């Protein structure tokens, strides 16, 4: 019975860790390119595990497309000056991101320039804000 329990726990752990890894995969993002669009905020979702910025952008056919940018969670965004109230529906923004490889409008958020010229970034990860201490030199 003990062997069965340990085997089951091991199997569940392996299966779960694969799902977590896939969730954070960047396989669908073209990290070699950036795209910049200008438009109007349709929705800003401030939350975990990811925040989202939806921007309505005029297209070449006279219509509009909604661009979806996946962002870091609030804990990272605040390190770049973001607040839950930084943007709201109707605000004009210029957004730069790493595009989806399949051509869908959107990607991974890099930065936004607000109407007043303020630039807000993606938010530093903890290791970028507090890098590991370096050994003292004599």
What is each of the regions a protein language model found here?
Residues 1-8:
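Bacterial N-terminal signal peptides that target proteins for export
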Residues 79-95:
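Short nucleic-acid-contacting surface segments enriched for D/E, G, S/T with interspersed K/R
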Residues 37-41:
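Conserved hydrophobic positions within beta-strands
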Residues 20-35:
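Short boundary/loop segments of OB/S1/cold-shock single-stranded nucleic-acid-binding domains
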Residues 100-124:
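OB-fold/S1-family single-stranded nucleic acid-binding modules
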Residues 9-10, 20:
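Cleavable N-terminal signal peptides
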Residues 47-58:
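Short aromatic-glycine-enriched beta-strand elements
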């Amino acid at each position: 019975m003990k062997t069965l329990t340990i085997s089951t726990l091991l199997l569940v752990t392996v299966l779960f860790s694969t799902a977590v890894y896939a969730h954070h995969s960047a396989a669908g993002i073209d990290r070699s390119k950036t795209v910049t669009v200008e438009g109007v905020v349709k929705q800003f979702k401030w939350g975990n595990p990811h925040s989202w910025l939806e921007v309505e952008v005029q297209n070449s056919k006279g219509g509009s497309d909604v661009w979806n940018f996946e962002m870091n969670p609030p804990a990272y965004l605040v390190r770049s000056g973001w607040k839950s109230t930084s943007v709201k529906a109707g605000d004009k923004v210029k957004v730069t991101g790493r595009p989806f490889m399949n051509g869908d409008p959107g990607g991974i958020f890099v930065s936004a320039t607000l109407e007043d010229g303020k630039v807000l970034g993606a938010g530093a990860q903890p290791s970028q804000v507090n890098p590991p201490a370096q050994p003292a030199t004599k």
